[in-house]
């Protein structure tokens, strides 16, 4: 039994959406990991009594003022938080569309039997 063209099209859309959703979730996870690393770095810097810290740049460590590095890290944290929020919104929209397509496909497959 061959599936109607509209059902085949919905299956393709469903599979593409599934791949996109996985990619969004993966990217969000990557940004969340970076965010946690940045927050941990700031936390560790605050524990340090020194006014200077070492920052990795191009494979070497450079001595820098702690306040400057903290400011840079804080800006990076802010950027990462925005990206994570953006990915969460995209994931939510895609998840909703995914569920709708899944329900439509189940109905279409149920009618075809």
Swiss-Prot record:
Biological-process GO terms, alphabetical: protein folding
GO function term, MF aspect, one: unfolded protein binding
Annotated Gene3D superfamilies: 1.10.287.370
Keywords: Chaperone, Cytoplasm
Location in or out of the cell: Cytoplasm
Pfam families for this protein: Prefoldin_2
Any Gene Ontology CC annotation: prefoldin complex
Domain of life from the UniProt record: Archaea
Main location: cytoplasm
Family: Belongs to the prefoldin subunit beta family.
Function: Molecular chaperone capable of stabilizing a range of proteins. Seems to fulfill an ATP-independent, HSP70-like function in archaeal de novo protein folding.
Subunit details: Heterohexamer of two alpha and four beta subunits.
Protein name according to UniProt: Prefoldin subunit beta
């Amino acid at each position: 039994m061959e599936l109607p063209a509209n059902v085949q099209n919905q299956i393709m859309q469903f599979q593409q959406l599934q791949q996109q959703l996985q990619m969004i979730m993966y990217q969000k996870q990557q940004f969340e990991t970076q965010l946690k690393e940045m927050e941990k770095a700031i936390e560790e810097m605050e524990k340090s009594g020194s006014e200077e810290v070492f920052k990795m740049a191009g494979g070497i460590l450079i001595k820098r003022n702690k306040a400057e590095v903290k400011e840079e890290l804080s800006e990076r944290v802010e950027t990462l938080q925005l990206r994570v929020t953006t990915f969460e919104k995209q994931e939510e929209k895609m998840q909703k569309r995914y569920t709708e397509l899944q329900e439509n496909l189940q109905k279409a497959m149920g009618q075809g039997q």
